[in-house]
Amino acid sequence: MALAKRIIPCLDVDNGRVVKGVKFENIRDAGDPVEIARRYNEQGADEITFLDITASVDGRDTTLHTVERMASQVFIPLTVGGGVRTVQDIRNLLNAGADKVSINTAAVFNPEFVGEAADRFGSQCIVVAIDAKKVSGPGEAPRWEIFTHGGRKPTGLDAVEWAKKMEGLGAGEILLTSMDQDGMKNGFDLGVTRAISDALGIPVIASGGVGNLQHLADGILEGHASAVLAASIFHFGEYTVPEAKAYMASRGIVVR
C-alpha cells in the first residue's frame, strides 16, 4: 500500500506574527500563530511547520514561548525551525513541544551538526531545510544552488549533492524550498523537487510557489515529493485543508 502523502500548512513567523512574502520579501501579516495553528489542526492538516524567519538573520533564538503555546493547542506533528544552531537549541525546542526541528543555515556552516543532532535525538526529529535557486542558464544542464540567511547568501553548494550529503549524515527529512517560486503562486519548481526526491531515500517536502490545488498534486505526481507544504493559499482562506485533500484524492493520491 502506498504511503499517504502529507499536506503541511507552513507558518512563517516574524516577531510573533504569521507573515507571508514573495521570494522572501514584501511581507504581509496573516495573524496569530497559535490561532492559525489551531485552525489547521481542526481542519485535519497532517502536520504544521513553524519557521521563525527572523531568527537566523537577526541571530536570535526561536520563540520558545510561542512553540509552547502552539504545542498545547495542536495535536499533530509540529516541526519548528529558525536560528537552530546548537544541540541545546534542539533540546529546548523538543522540550517546548516540537516533534521535529528544522536546521537550515547552521547545516551549511557545520554539516557535522546534522550528524550530531541525528545521533543525539534520532533522525526522525531532524529535518534539513534547503533553500535552492536555479543557477544554470538556457541550454545548460539544470543546476540548483543552496542559499542561506533567508535566501540572501549564495553558498556555491549544489542542491542535489548537498541533499545527498545531509541524508548520509542522518537527516530524516528534507524541506525543499524553491526560492525562484516562493510566494509566486505559479507552482513548485518541479525540476529541483524531482531531482532531489529521486536522489534520496528519505522524504522530501516540497515548498515554495503553491497557488492552487493542482500545484499541490503536481508536487507529488510530477515532483515525486512525499509531502507538500503551503502557506498563502491556506492563510488567506483561498482553500481549506479538506478541499486540498479531496482534490489530491481525486487525482489518485493517497491522503490521510
Curated annotation (Swiss-Prot):
The UniProt entry's GO biological process terms, in alphabetical order, are: L-histidine biosynthetic process
| Pfam families named in the record | His_biosynth (PF00977)
Localization per Swiss-Prot or TrEMBL: Cytoplasm
Residue spans crossing the bilayer: none
Per its UniProt entry, which superkingdom is the organism in?
Bacteria
Main subcellular location: cytoplasm
> Which Gene3D superfamilies does this entry report, sorted A to Z?
Aldolase class I
Enzyme Commission number: 4.3.2.10
User: What positions does UniProt annotate as the active site of this protein?
Assistant: 12, 131
Q: What keywords were assigned to this record? A: Amino-acid biosynthesis, Cytoplasm, Histidine biosynthesis, Lyase
This enzyme catalyses: 5-[(5-phospho-1-deoxy-D-ribulos-1-ylimino)methylamino]-1-(5-phospho-beta-D-ribosyl)imidazole-4-carboxamide + L-glutamine = D-erythro-1-(imidazol-4-yl)glycerol 3-phosphate + 5-amino-1-(5-phospho-beta-D-ribosyl)imidazole-4-carboxamide + L-glutamate + H(+)
- Quote one Gene Ontology molecular function term: lyase activity
Q: Name one GO cellular component term.
A: cytoplasm
The pathway is: Amino-acid biosynthesis; L-histidine biosynthesis; L-histidine from 5-phospho-alpha-D-ribose 1-diphosphate: step 5/9
Q: How does it assemble?
A: Heterodimer of HisH and HisF.
User: What family does the Swiss-Prot or TrEMBL record give for this protein?
Assistant: Belongs to the HisA/HisF family.
Q: What does this protein do?
A: IGPS catalyzes the conversion of PRFAR and glutamine to IGP, AICAR and glutamate. The HisF subunit catalyzes the cyclization activity that produces IGP and AICAR from PRFAR using the ammonia provided by the HisH subunit.
- Name-wise, this protein is Imidazole glycerol phosphate synthase subunit HisF
Organism annotation: Pseudomonas entomophila (strain L48)
